[in-house]
Amino acid sequence: MSGAPSLADKTVMIVDDDQTMRMLIRRMLTRMKIGTLTEAEGGQHALQQLELAPAECNLVICDWNMPGMSGVELFGHIRALKPGLPFLMLTGRSDAGSVVAARNAGVPAYIVKPISPEELKTKVSYLLAKTA
């Protein structure tokens, strides 16, 4: 048996206004055998879900650019609601200024689209291992 922690008891929330992107990420996470996957169409919807059941989420994977509330804004709200919740930002922004802005906002992990399954698996496994 490997030393890797089981992901079967973990819950991951996917936040993206693009349904196709949510489905793609869901497919990748399903292959990783994550126990429960939830989805939110935007920041407000994600916050509502987290307020109803904050203990039931182990990781939020979120797009940066969404209408109404950006991923960086959502991250700030989540930090106030559940400070230790791991957060992974997904974005098409690859310029140095955007990376610095995300880091300055405290975003702990960042993937530039297009997302590779290997990179997603590495970051998700790392972030979830910190919650074990």
List the predicted regions and their residue ranges:
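Two-component/phosphorelay signaling modules centered on CheY-like receiver
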Residues: 19-38
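Helix N-cap/capping motif at the beta->alpha junctions
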Residues: 39-48, 71
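Active-site beta3 strand of CheY-like receiver
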Residues: 54-61
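Alpha4 helix (beta4-alpha4-beta5 surface) of REC/receiver domains from two-component response regulators
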Residues: 73, 94-109
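C-terminal output helix
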Residues: 97, 115-124
